[in-house]
Amino acid sequence: MKKFLYTMIAGASLALAACNSQPQSTDMASQKKDIGLQLYSIRQLIGNAETFATNGDSILARLAGMGYTCVEAANYGNGKLYGMDPEAYKACVEKAGLKSLSTHTTRGLSEEELKAGAASEETMKWWDECIAAHKAAGVEYIVTPWQNLPKTLEELKLWCEYHNAIGKKCAEAGIKYGYHNHAHEFKKVEDQVMLAYMIENTDPQYVFFELDVYWTVMGQASPVEYFKKYPGRFKLLHIKDHKEIGQSGMVGFDAIFKNAEVAGVEHIIVEAEAYECADMMDGVKLCADYLLNADFVKACYSK
């Protein structure tokens, strides 16, 4: 515990020092890497329709200037992203020199559907509209960001069948479908670890996993062990730390990236939920700088 606290304090001190230091001049051309940002990381700035309309152009341009190449959306509803028609969202992102790569959105199964043992026709129609909107937005990956811990293994099996059905619909539209973990997926449902069961009971043809490396560590599991046990299942990675990336010492990023090929990684996406930096855009830049300057991070992972 003392070692953990020391590491956290030391990491926080380094992050604060980096936030307060003068920006270093870097040759972005020589350090160009394919790095995405989950826009939830800056939700206070462009987290909804109103703030995106006000700040979207300037914030996205700043992200491109930091070295980010693509974004993952986190605000979809009623056929729109951040209150915009899909085509308008795509144009806004591309105007900044970024790519509309992926999104976090989902519709869960209701208690009635769980009791019935199947998703309703209304739910699957919702997915048809969702997929069509994201196709128009140029999105390549749709990711379900959350699912509660099921009460029984039978319920978890139903969720896996649901993910397969969504994934099949996405595949028919030329979009890849995945699931993003937090820490609770490493708990057991009856005698099965939730995430392991999900990986083993979803069709690789239709469902991939976006492993959040920080939440995996917080769930007392090893990202690298999951890569080796389930090779090729992790097309996206959420690169996350306690705060700014690389500052806590909690996550073994070098080993994670050295095993990215085994995992099947196609893109890496930064997500930050809290910052040492007073200005979150400074924190987002620190995350990009860490990855741009890390020798163990390749320029591109997509095939």
Model-derived regions, located:
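Positively charged n-region of N-terminal signal peptides that target proteins for export
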Residues: 1-4
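N-terminal pre-domain/capping segments
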Residues: 6-7, 19-140, 289, 293-303
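Bacterial N-terminal signal peptides
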Residues: 7-15
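Acidic/histidine-rich catalytic cores of soluble enzymes
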Residues: 30, 70-71, 171-257
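Hydrophobic faces of well-ordered beta-strands that scaffold small-molecule active sites
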Residues: 33-39, 71-73, 100-105, 142-144, ...
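Acidic-and-aromatic substrate-binding clefts and catalytic sites of carbohydrate-active enzymes
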Residues: 43-52, 73-85, 107-124, 148-157, ...
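Active-site acidic/histidine proton-transfer and metal-coordination neighborhood
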Residues: 99, 111-208, 281, 301-302
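Aromatic-rich peripheral "rim/lid" segments of glycoside hydrolase catalytic domains that contact
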Residues: 259, 273-303
